[in-house]
Regions:
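Bacterial N-terminal signal peptides that target proteins for export
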Residues: 1-8
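C-terminal motif of bacterial Sec signal peptides marking the signal peptidase cleavage site
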Residues: 17-20
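Bacterial signal peptide processing site
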Residues: 22-25
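N-terminal, intrinsically disordered, polar/charged segments of Gram-positive cell-envelope systems
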Residues: 28-40
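A surface/extracellular/periplasmic glyco- and lipid-processing/surface-interacting theme
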Residues: 38-56, 60-78, 87-313
């Protein structure tokens, strides 16, 4: 059975990045002199991996969450998934892959301002279909130039016949990774913006002091982004997973199995006007991931309220 994503991060308004930790199997040195050895663990989960685990690329992919595209392809392979509010009251995912990159991910959709703050600290490759002019300009200014951008028109970005646009764009990860590895200018596609200035520094983190709090027992979690996006989670003590539903309908993987995750993080942040209209002329929200606020970390059937703080986007 496929292991579930380690962390699923979402918010009452949008999202903010946190990390998880776990066991590791770092090998010791065989020499007489002490030697620093890179632990054989995956960067995003902290779980044991191959010796070169931390050298594997981290790929962030924007994925649609409209009801007509479910079940999506590849989400159950992600190490980390962000959920964010977009126009029309719908939500979308930024799925992050490293330890288990599937052959296909999709449907791939467009970028938003908030994705820069999500991808910048962690991504080697950022995959999205395209974006509004203001968003693409912001991306060119703020996303680190070391992050390869892959958009429609790039190798591995394919439109599926028989599937209605715009939800027919899917990522062939093997084709994309091969193209990025072989390219001197790995960003590719129709909509890659030219970088305009140096990117903002990625936020730093510090280890917390003291023992971890015990937390309060929780059996269900209900989140309302809008009347259209109301994800619910129920703790499954047998499988040790939070199982997702969309309203009253179970959220499933492509093979029909139920979608679950080990950990949930709920972030309370602000939404402001992005300054442009969507394709249907409606308001486009912009999630603000700088500042501070409340958050809830849920794991092993328990919830702990915490405070988040992030000085810059």
């Amino acid at each position: 059975m496929k292991s579930a994503p380690r962390i699923f991060i979402f918010g009452l308004a949008a999202v903010f990045a946190l990390s998880s930790c776990g066991s590791n199997d770092g090998a010791g040195s065989g020499s007489d002199s002490p030697e620093v050895v890179t632990p054989a663990i995956w960067s995003l989960t902290g779980l044991a991996g191959p010796d070169d685990a931390q050298l594997k690329p981290i790929v962030v992919v924007k994925v649609e969450n409209n009801s007509i595209v479910r079940p999506q392809t590849g989400l159950d392979h992600a190490d980390l998934i962000f959920e964010e509010l977009v126009e029309g009251g719908a939500s979308r995912f930024a799925a992050v892959f490293q330890s288990d990159i599937p052959d296909e991910v999709g449907p791939v959709r467009s970028v938003r301002h908030v994705d820069v703050s999500l991808a910048s600290p962690i991504a080697d490759i950022f995959v999205f279909s395209g974006g509004a002019k203001k968003t693409m300009k912001y991306l060119g200014l703020e996303l680190p130039t070391a992050v390869s951008q892959v958009t429609e028109g790039a190798p591995g970005m394919n439109r599926k016949p028989g599937v209605s646009a715009p939800n027919n764009l899917f990522l062939d990860t093997k084709q994309m990774l091969a193209a990025v590895a072989q390219s001197d200018t790995p960003s590719s596609g129709f909509f890659v913006p030219a970088p305009v200035s140096a990117a903002s520094p990625a936020p730093s983190s510090s280890a917390s002091a003291g023992p971890a709090p015990v937390g309060k027992a929780v059996s269900t979690v209900e989140v309302a982004f809008s009347t259209l996006a109301e994800p619910n989670w129920k703790w499954n003590a047998t499988d040790k997973l939070w199982m997702r539903s969309e309203g009253t309908k179970p959220f499933t993987n492509k093979d029909g199995s139920l979608f679950g995750t080990n950990n949930l993080v709920i972030i309370e942040i602000r939404e402001v006007d992005a300054g442009y209209k969507g394709s249907t002329g409606g308001y486009v929200p912009r999630s603000v991931t700088s500042g501070s606020g409340r958050a809830w970390v849920l794991s092993n059937g328990k919830a702990v309220e915490v405070k988040w703080n992030k000085p810059t986007v």
